[in-house]
Amino acid sequence: MGLQMTAARPIAALSLLVLSLLTWTHPTIVDAAHPPEIIRKPQNQGVRVGGVASFYCAARGDPPPSIVWRKNGKKVSGTQSRYTVLEQPGGISILRIEPVRAGRDDAPYECVAENGVGDAVSADATLTIYEGDKTPAGFPVITQGPGTRVIEVGHTVLMTCKAIGNPTPNIYWIKNQTKVDMSNPRYSLKDGFLQIENSREEDQGKYECVAENSMGTEHSKATNLYVKVRRVPPTFSRPPETISEVMLGSNLNLSCIAVGSPMPHVKWMKGSEDLTPENEMPIGRNVLQLINIQESANYTCIAASTLGQIDSVSVVKVQSLPTAPTDVQISEVTATSVRLEWSYKGPEDLQYYVIQYKPKNANQAFSEISGIITMYYVVRALSPYTEYEFYVIAVNNIGRGPPSAPATCTTGETKMESAPRNVQVRTLSSSTMVITWEPPETPNGQVTGYKVYYTTNSNQPEASWNSQMVDNSELTTVSELTPHAIYTVRVQAYTSMGAGPMSTPVQVKAQQGVPSQPSNFRATDIGETAVTLQWTKPTHSSENIVHYELYWNDTYANQAHHKRISNSEAYTLDGLYPDTLYYIWLAARSQRGEGATTPPIPVRTKQYVPGAPPRNITAIATSSTTISLSWLPPPVERSNGRIIYYKVFFVEVGREDDEATTMTLNMTSIVLDELKRWTEYKIWVLAGTSVGDGPRSHPIILRTQEDVPGDPQDVKATPLNSTSIHVSWKPPLEKDRNGIIRGYHIHAQELRDEGKGFLNEPFKFDVVDTLEFNVTGLQPDTKYSIQVAALTRKGDGDRSAAIVVKTPGGVPVRPTVSLKIMEREPIVSIELEWERPAQTYGELRGYRLRWGVKDQALKEEMLSGPQMTKKRFDNLERGVEYEFRVAGSNHIGIGQETVKIFQTPEGTPGGPPSNITIRFQTPDVLCVTWDPPTREHRNGIITRYDVQFHKKIDHGLGSERNMTLRKAVFTNLEENTEYIFRVRAYTKQGAGPFSDKLIVETERDMGRAPMSLQAEATSEQTAEIWWEPVTSRGKLLGYKIFYTMTAVEDLDDWQTKTVGLTESADLVNLEKFAQYAVAIAARFKNGLGRLSEKVTVRIKPEDVPLNLRAHDVSTHSMTLSWSPPIRLTPVNYKISFDAMKVFVDSQGFSQTQIVPKREIILKHYVKTHTINELSPFTTYNVNVSAIPSDYSYRPPTKITVTTQMAAPQPMVKPDFYGVVNGEEILVILPQASEEYGPISHYYLVVVPEDKSNLHKIPDQFLTDDLLPGRNKPERPNAPYIAAKFPQRSIPFTFHLGSGDDYHNFTNRKLEREKRYRIFVRAVVDTPQKHLYTSSPFSEFLSLDMREAPPGERPHRPDPNWPAEPEVSVNRNKDEPEILWVVLPLMVSTFIVSTALIVLCVVKRRRQPCKTPDQAAVTRPLMAADLGAGPTPSDPVDMRRLNFQTPGMISHPPIPISEFANHIERLKSNDNQKFSQEYESIEPGQQFTWDNSNLEHNKSKNRYANVTAYDHSRVQLPAVEGVVGSDYINANYCDGYRKHNAYVATQGPLQETFVDFWRMCWELKTATIVMMTRLEERTRIKCDQYWPTRGTETYGQIFVTITETQELATYSIRTFQLCRQGFNDRREIKQLQFTAWPDHGVPDHPAPFLQFLRRCRALTPPESGPVIVHCSAGVGRTGCYIVIDSMLERMKHEKIIDIYGHVTCLRAQRNYMVQTEDQYIFIHDAILEAIICGVTEVPARNLHTHLQKLLITEPGETISGMEVEFKKLSNVKMDSSKFVTANLPCNKHKNRLVHILPYESSRVYLTPIHGIEGSDYVNASFIDGYRYRSAYIAAQGPVQDAAEDFWRMLWEHNSTIVVMLTKLKEMGREKCFQYWPHERSVRYQYYVVDPIAEYNMPQYKLREFKVTDARDGSSRTVRQFQFIDWPEQGVPKSGEGFIDFIGQVHKTKEQFGQDGPITVHCSAGVGRSGVFITLSIVLERMQYEGVLDVFQTVRILRSQRPAMVQTEDQYHFCYRAALEYLGSFDNYTN
């Protein structure tokens, strides 16, 4: 304003200034005052009595007037009753009268306004009050008033109001006695209804609607409108990052998001500085942008609303590289190490330090040590006496900082390691020589001098040589030499540490003018017959050298040679023998004479291919499919090296030699198997060295043995008459004859009339040289089945298909025959009587009578006339079956026969046993066998034998044995002694006569047995035995080892192993933890020697290293680790390893590489070792043995380790050969060596010339880029793959550009005027990618190069053909040469005989016997027929009847009442009787497993020794075209009274998933029982064969998982199965028991029994067999089947037959119930089931069950509840279960001396170093219903253990603690207060800070923050203390306690971590047991609808003693469970 004033108007300006001042001091001067004015007058009102009257008055003025109300001239006060005065903005005043009263309120009312300016103004109105019904007509009446409403903020509400009157009343609304302002746009009024939109909190209040017309005014009743507002305090939905690390100068956005209701404002602060302006604070989200950050800072995000404020701090940390360390100091300097120390003054966020060092001034890279976390380090492995410089670098998470200043030092001296170099000697005269040298290369110190040694006799020790000391100069002169003598000179250097090694000897001749010694004499190129020598001429030759003298001798001919050669520095010495060691030396000669020679150097010539084939090749056909082949090596003089392999070729005669099968091996014998039957083979052999194959031997022609033939062809049968049939046939097909057909068998069998089933005994007719035969002696009018079988020498073959033919009728039918006994003694006589046939078909002419012993030739008699109808037979044999046949005859012929069988009574045998045979098993063990007496003398069934055996001189005073077998074994016989043997037989009637005395004489000299036999387990399946060898005297062939788990006398029942001339052997495939007896005998040419003493070994490794593993196996190294032996304390460990591998080299030759054995000795504390310098793809035999303190022998533990494959070795480049037809290029392709792994395939890659490819090498062309693809653009000159060649089929020559396809790659046509390069890529057969080697590029190739030369194309050398013709050397034949003829013959004879013996033994053990007399041995107990239903007899009982083994006889079933005592007897003496009983289990039969051993089935077996018996295996329907598709490693197993109740199988492999599910489908199985986890002890036990989610397809089976339930000890999975082509869906449940420990058996059987009962409950009765598997399908699987079957047996019988059932199972699958521990566990489980019974109750029956428990039954003294609780207490406590708890250092930590945790379930704490017992706390892990170790049951902590209690909670992540006691009860301390009350307290490492305490009606909840002071981490722990448990007894009701349990578990689910809930009372067993029991019982009721309080407590007591301590507590568990059920209708109704 001042800027606009001008000088022309000074007066106006002045006036304005004065006015401004006056305005500031007296503002009224400017603003004029206004008197009051009423702008709204009150209106007259008429109201009902009791209604509401409201007068409104408004006034204005300046200043605003005040309004008062007057009634009848008197002021109305707002404090008066019923009168209210309300003042509102805008000068409005309201007078409200409520309720109005007649006679008191009807009066005039005046509104008076005044403001001190002018006079007061007023306006009045009259209130008229109508009583009752005196209201005027038309008075408004509200017909619908508003009601109370509740809405949420933001919603719309409609307040209703309707009124009537005349005139129509006007309606308006009052809120909180004030008229509603309808100018608010959210308010609207329609037809009297008030609508409020988008409601707000201020809309809440009391509302009235008012109806008004000229007749009066009516108010509605006041009603409330409530507006609900969600009030949520602010929280961060996305708090800012706690810490952000950024680089210096970078940018960062910090986001902070908060929510709440109302939404909070969000702002950022840096310290106390606001970074967000108040007027710009965003709601909900705020992003802070930090730009060019220069410093670390704390930023705080604050979110605030009306309900509070929260904040979160974000640290922005600026990162930078660390500074350099300072003050690097060096100390403790030694010859090979120094200690560095340094300081660091930078920030503390370093990760580690790096030390760099190298010799100072050396031109080499720094060595580096990384990862140092201290500020000192000892640098080792330095070179002695070397100046080093060191740098230290600090490293943080950004990177490395700058290096420190260098620190230098010189390492100390040490003993010298090298000798003086380049020693040179020359003669100055014949008596003086001068010697010069150079200092040692690594003196390791300062050289102080030298000592020169010289002598004329170098064989003397150096101490006897002449010597001369020299200072540190490098030259000296020696005088007074003997002229013409040859001196040897050596030089030795000295340092302060002493003398170093001597130099290499140098020779010189003390003669002036002769040359000195040539130097550097060496062999540079060594061949098979020649060697190239090189040397350096003498340094001092004085005169010119005229020639050299070369000397050599060979170790083959033991001859010395000498040759004079010309003056040069190289020479090739030839004419040598291959593979021979030579010593070669050299001297120079001048005109004066010959100088000193060089030292002899050893040179071995290379090996060469053998010059002769193997000798004495012998072939023997050992069966119809095998040939045994043996040979001797080639003659030694023609081997040309070490023979490392042999190749055997065999081919059928008539086929080409190149079709022969080749076998490579490193032994001199082999059995060729899987040959064709009765087929001629041509066989030849060659030998090979490392160079290649030698010449072939002359072929041998040999035919395999005969076999049984196939079935005859075109069989026809025609009836000739009523008793004869003509049969004709053709021989079997040529391919099926399998030998010379020597005849035929015709089998005729009578059929029943209806054609179903056979009748009477079959007929068999032998036919020799014809193809037709008349079968006679048949019955008329009878159907017969006719079959024909061919015969070879091996027996009769397959029968032809049966032909049914019927003989003609018309002959008499069968007569009725009866038989009666006439006499029994002294002879047997019977009378046969018959009746006339019912139909004779003509005149009956008589009868034919045939009779005799059954299966013998029958006598025949014709009886004429029909009147003869009886016949007497006298003098019949005793004890045999007679057959009598009677038939009538008519004019047609003989009629049908009636057969009558009669068993004659038995008598005593009439003769002795026959065919007595003796055999010495060893010289002192005799085996005698015999047959029963001959049939005519047998007189009945032989029941036993009496055997007498004694020395001849004892005159019958020997032993007598009663035997049921026809075999006796006698041991410990004396040498050169005669023994007498005789035997007699018994029938039921008594004994027969003894046999004649058989005299047996033992050898005169049995020789001594092997001594000092020892055995020791080397693993859980192997053992090693060793012994002192027997003095051979030239006759010893080897040894035979006998071993068995049952040490019977008969060595034929022992397992055997034959070994050669050795002193140790390994026994494999032994039973884990089983006890074996072992003995050994020497093998001589004439048999075995005396048997050694027997030793026993338990297959439990104790003195060998355990858990030998190979880790980190690479191409050139492996790391071994092992554990120490259990018993032995070693002083060292010894590692030894060797290997041999055969591979094909780059020329196609088979090479054998032998890695010699290496040994490594390690200290006893070393448990891991890395072996380096290994070869790729080589299988090493690794042994680790523990060396005891006496250094005696201990066997090693062994593994085989194969190193990784590597890329092939480099190849040569492809070569050009020539252009063919102008279109193709013939190239020669290289082949790669397979030394580092088998080659999978080769690629031939063509690279057209292109600028982009000129500088690339072949390896730069990636295979993926070369492979054709749809999305790859084609470049005109792009490289491509022209061909792919499979393994070993790469051609030597190849036509490039032919246009042909090679394994889906096209050999494209070549273009003219374009150049190409090619290379070959060899790919190793390994899953790893890019493991290949590429050859170099070929030269550039094009079609305009030269044509290919004419003639034969080049070819790769044939590895089967010798490279050079055989060279023969003529030698003088003299007498000693005879030895070279005789000796090989002797050796070959020995080898052949040994091979035959081994072959026989192996064949006897491997091949099942197929002869008829073995049928009873191999016949299964029952055929595997799936369709068979339950049999009337139990399969175990049937086995006891049919196969009475000694074990079954001596182990009968046990009555249930005696079972507990029986187990106690078996467990006595450390389970000795259990061991004996378990080891005696033997099915008494031999079974085959041929299908498992078929080559195509071997990969389907998880373990090689666990196979499926053929007779009981599960046969799947074969898939057409798939060999072996009917096989799965599974067997049917019998249950109780149910055949094939189970299928025992192995854990499925990846390749058997389809077979497994196919088996489930085919068998209609509904239940799979899985007894293993997928992985145990880091070993794969079973592959996951089911889908984790969704559906998986297994072949034609679709498996869908529909439900998974995981419980503490088992899991249940439900699957739906569909099959392709089938409409039905099937449900299968899989129950997996997960509580079986990795090692051994479960500690207690109760969880397993619970699992087993669940399995049975979920298995439908009509389903197929239950499939049970573990890993091998024999151990745990057997346990399940036996226990399940025994539980079923107990329901129906009063006996237990575990022994019988295990025996039965072992006849159906091998190794069932695999260990003794499993066998004992079965007994314990059955005893547990007997003692406890079945206590599981359906939930709906709980009330009835509880009532029964509380009743004392008649005749009983205690109730069922007491009985159950007493059973719980019948658990024997063994002090060995509480080892740690009873230690003296832990006893004070136990509140009660008898409540201690079991060792197996106690809670382990991390031990504190130096504090004994620091790992102990009195607490136990307890399993819940769904989780293992879900709870910790602990005692109330004592004062000494409070710190351990918090340590337990922290280490095991337990964040919920349940306390069920008060600190003191009944005046005694029950628990120490282990928690802080008001402030934080530290318990050892942990700081416990109380957060809050909540007092609930029944419990207290305390929250604590627990912080680990070591790292600052923290977590919240909540403690629930139940305070309603009475100090005595139990709660009256369980309802409160159940609610408490629910609250604890609900909190656990919401806030708890994965750890267990810790529960404690005082002792941690009583109330704690109740809490855990009810938790489990209630949860199980929810899931299964059943409960089992007894078993639940029983299982708890197996984890902690005395759980649920009193009977009251036990009863309370039942009551609480019942109360819980009462809240559910479905259980109570």
Swiss-Prot record:
The keyword Transmembrane helix applies. It catalyses: O-phospho-L-tyrosyl-[protein] + H2O = L-tyrosyl-[protein] + phosphate. Selectively expressed in a subset of axons and pioneer neurons in the embryo. It is found in: Membrane. Keywords: Cell adhesion, Disulfide bond, Glycoprotein, Heparin-binding, Hydrolase, Immunoglobulin domain, Membrane, Neurogenesis, Phosphoprotein, Protein phosphatase, Receptor, Repeat, Signal, Transmembrane, Transmembrane helix. Gene3D superfamilies: Immunoglobulins, Protein tyrosine phosphatase superfamily. It is a single-pass type I membrane protein. Residues 1-32 form the signal peptide. Residues 1346-1358 have a biased composition (Basic and acidic residues). Its main location: membrane. Residues 1474-1729, 1761-2020 form the Tyrosine-protein phosphatase domain. Residues 1403-2029 are cytoplasmic. Residues 36-128, 140-224, 234-316 form the Ig-like C2-type domain. This is Tyrosine-protein phosphatase Lar. It comes from Drosophila melanogaster (Fruit fly). The gene is Lar.
